[in-house]
Amino acid sequence: KGGKTQGRSAKSSRPEFDWRDPLVLEEQLTADEILIRDTFRTYCQEHLMPRIVLANRNEVFHREIISEMGELGVLGPTIKGYGCAGVSSVAYGLLARELERVDSGYRSAMSVQSSLVMHPIYAYGSEEQQQQKYLPRLAKGELLGCFGLTEPNHGSDPGSMETRALHNPSNRSYTLNGAKTWITNSPVADLFVVWARCEDNCIRGFLLEKGMRGLSAPKIEGKFSLRASATGMIIMDDVEVPEENVLPKASSLAVPFGCLNNARYGISWGVLGAAEFCLHTARQYTLDRIQFGVPLAKNQLIQRKLADMLTEITLGLHACLQLGRLKDQDKVTPEMVSLLKRNNCGKALDIARQARDMLGGNGISDEYHVIRHAMNLEAVNTYEGTHDIHALILGRAITGIQAFTTDK
């Protein structure tokens, strides 16, 4: 009897597999990280999810969302001081995951504000003229920023940019001419972080403010992706920018690339939130949908697809966790970020497409949200380094040979 009792006791104490957290990510998070995530999840589900269908249908970006996020303290969250939260990189990733679980467009707006506007000002800006002037208002969501690097003729090759900055020593200013395109937030931005080539051939960062003469930001219409975020151009026609608006510690292309790596890190987390939504939706739909007298989920093909989705999401999340811990130890390389940006975006897009298919005809209805995630992820797989560009970054690291151009 004693043996049988011990056997039953041992069996009952055996851990149970939880498909919602297969490798127990929860136990590897700090109490603060869990609290931050759960608080923001509540906001996202209660305040953003009810808006997203109509926002996406009507191609409308709700500017007040940024102010709401500012009140929650999630803008520039890893920055210390200036009204920012100073949280861990993992906490930032968890925020991106919860936001993109609702919509990639919303995450894009937050990501640009935090990683591509606030980060360069914090890392490369002057203390009084730039950091103190802009960061507190950006953190509160009073100001909304954008990041201008991509140009009409130069996407994956920003080093060939045509935007020029001419120095005017007499009045201590620069004159900027050129155009940037596919710029998240630009039509509604108050602050523009723009990269331009100067006469000494150095690429420098400039802070342009809404209302400067010669500066315009027309909206790009007709997008089939990221419809709930504002995307546009930045047109500069003899825009005069004072010297005090030049980022003093930024004088090479490595600087905007460093900013992009910060954003790519957040994207790697974010896309898995979208993928998780698609997995959960496909699972519930195939459990509820009866065909040939049984749930679709009884079909072996369906179960294999769900298993594949769960596997990729789980591996991606734990890789992100490791990358976040390394980031806080200042041990991250650009190649590490490229590996996860490329893998997680590609896998998330595949998962969204599979989920769309599993929902049958209902899969193309925005009421189920999956088609919106699929369309969004098409863009996320492309921006901030395409799937192929990140492959070349990794290929160069593996072989020691760059394959971006035909140069020997």
From Swiss-Prot:
The modification N6-acetyllysine is found at K210. Pathway: Amino-acid metabolism; lysine degradation; Amino-acid metabolism; tryptophan metabolism. Residues 1-13 form a transit peptide. Belongs to the acyl-CoA dehydrogenase family. Transmembrane segments: none annotated. Catalyzes the oxidative decarboxylation of glutaryl-CoA to crotonyl-CoA and CO(2) in the degradative pathway of L-lysine, L-hydroxylysine, and L-tryptophan metabolism. It uses electron transfer flavoprotein as its electron acceptor. One of its GO terms (cellular component) is mitochondrial matrix. Its main location: mitochondrion. PROSITE patterns: ACYL_COA_DH_2 (PS00073). CDD domains: GCD. Substrate binds at R107, S108, S156, F257, G258, C259, L260, N261, N262, A263, R264, G385. Homotetramer. Gene3D superfamilies: Acyl-CoA dehydrogenase/oxidase, N-terminal domain (1.10.540.10), Butyryl-CoA Dehydrogenase, subunit A, domain 2 (2.40.110.10), Butyryl-CoA Dehydrogenase, subunit A, domain 3 (1.20.140.10). The lineage of its organism: Eukaryota, Metazoa, Chordata, Craniata, Vertebrata. The active site is at E384 (proton acceptor). Its cofactor is FAD. This is Glutaryl-CoA dehydrogenase, mitochondrial.
